[in-house]
């Protein structure tokens, strides 16, 4: 049972557009009961125990969904500890995230299994952002494009290994990053599709033709577009070219202005269907960390002046971002992306792509995971399942 609430005097960004000067009623089931224009508010009759909260002319949006991150606040999936995952949940709620997919690095198989089991154990115990399931980045990826993943964990395609990872996840693995060019990938892709696991092309040296072959067996999404993948060349489109050319290919994007230049983000939005673009952070354990040494997947890290983490021993190697979804939202809006499009990328699209029923859009009957922002895009409140878990109205 949730507390009944009414949010008034806001622009409601539904996930398919925006409605100015509107309000949202959250019912006792933790669902969106109604969306109404403020001209009708005086004629509305709500139960007497309903709390009325004034958005003050700000924005009422779906809670943001981060479908790819490794850590935040000094806690990460590499800790192999349910406590760390639950701490991530708390810290993500502080920055407007209502749901997330903790992402497991490529590592030794035993380490990956421990990480997966820790996330599964944490599920259902959250006091902040809900854990939707597990994102596994590897291990069937290209050594040439390994990036910050542990090269010792990179493996050839092996269905027995895949099954060990799936079994460790107890049905909670939602998606996995793979290199489509690897031998045996067709069989693995069909096997994954039977189990409802979304495969993303990433950490890949695939040719344009390899990506087309992957699409034929259901590899229709891609990991942190432009990063850790074969480049666009006028004689070989590579993975980057394939994702740009093929309208059905979906892609993640890290909107920190460092991993991808803002003008390329704008180009992507111009040339690709908005439905197929997902905002992520790829944030690391030391994101928003206060004090202590900075490490990510065991690699000593340094926070560069541009806000991205680089390997301490190799400042040319990006190992992930220090981004939050809320800052990513502000960034793309600064790059002249309308807020309704930004919210679609941060909430609606990941919910649809990963089959998250009744999430990612503000429509009656959907789960009341709601983010309230002021006019300057600062967080005022976060509701999860209709419960006000972060209150900054005062």
Model-derived features: where do they sit?
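Histidine-rich, glycine-flanked metal-binding segment
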Residues: 1-6, 12-61
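Residue-level marker for buried hydrophobic side chains located in beta-strands
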Residues: 6, 63-65, 200, 279-280
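C-terminal cap of metal-dependent C-N hydrolases
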Residues: 10, 352, 362-394
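Metal-associated gating/positioning segment near the N- to mid-region
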Residues: 55-114
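Conserved, mostly hydrophobic/aromatic
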Residues: 68, 136, 192, 222, ...
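Divalent-metal coordination cores built from histidine and acidic residues
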Residues: 89-172
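Active-site core of metal-dependent hydrolases
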Residues: 167-290
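His/Asp/Glu-enriched, well-ordered alpha-helical/loop segment
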Residues: 238, 242-251, 270-281, 287-366, ...
């Amino acid at each position: 049972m949730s507390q009944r609430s009414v949010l008034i005097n806001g622009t409601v960004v539904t996930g398919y557009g925006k409605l100015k000067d509107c309000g949202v009623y959250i019912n006792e089931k933790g669902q969106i009961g109604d969306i109404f224009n403020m001209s009708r508010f005086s004629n509305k009759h709500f139960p007497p125990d309903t709390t009325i909260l004034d958005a003050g002319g700000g924005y009422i949006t779906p809670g943001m969904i981060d479908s790819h991150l490794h850590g935040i606040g000094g806690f990460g999936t590499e800790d192999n500890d349910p406590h760390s995952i639950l701490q991530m949940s708390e810290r993500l709620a502080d920055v407007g995230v209502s749901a997330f997919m903790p992402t497991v690095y490529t590592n030794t198989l035993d380490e990956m299994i421990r990480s997966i089991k820790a996330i599964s154990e944490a599920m259902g115990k959250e006091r902040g952002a809900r854990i939707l399931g597990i994102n596994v980045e590897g291990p069937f990826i290209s050594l040439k494009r390994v990036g910050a993943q542990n090269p010792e964990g990179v493996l050839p395609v092996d269905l027995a290994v895949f099954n060990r990872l799936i079994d460790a996840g107890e049905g909670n693995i939602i998606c996995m990053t793979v290199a489509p060019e690897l031998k045996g990938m067709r069989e693995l892709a069909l096997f994954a599709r039977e189990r409802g696991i979304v495969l993303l092309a990433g950490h890949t040296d695939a040719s344009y033709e390899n990506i087309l072959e992957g699409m034929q067996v259901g590899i229709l999404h891609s990991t942190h577009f432009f990063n850790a993948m074969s480049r666009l060349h006028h004689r070989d489109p590579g993975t980057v070219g394939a994702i740009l050319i093929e309208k059905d290919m979906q892609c993640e994007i890290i909107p920190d202005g460092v991993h991808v230049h803002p003008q390329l983000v704008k180009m992507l939005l111009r040339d690709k269907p908005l439905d197929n673009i997902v905002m992520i952070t790829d944030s690391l354990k030391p994101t928003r960390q206060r004090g202590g040494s900075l490490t990510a997947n065991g690699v000593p890290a340094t926070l560069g002046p541009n806000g991205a983490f680089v390997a301490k021993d190799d400042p040319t190697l990006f190992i992930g971002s220090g981004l939050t979804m809320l800052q990513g939202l502000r960034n793309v809006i600064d790059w002249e992306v309308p807020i309704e499009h930004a919210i679609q990328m941060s909430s609606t699209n990941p919910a649809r792509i990963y089959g998250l029923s009744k999430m990612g859009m503000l429509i009656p009957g959907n789960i009341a995971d709601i983010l309230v922002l002021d006019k300057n895009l600062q967080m005022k409140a976060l509701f999860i399942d209709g419960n006000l878990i972060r209150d900054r109205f005062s």
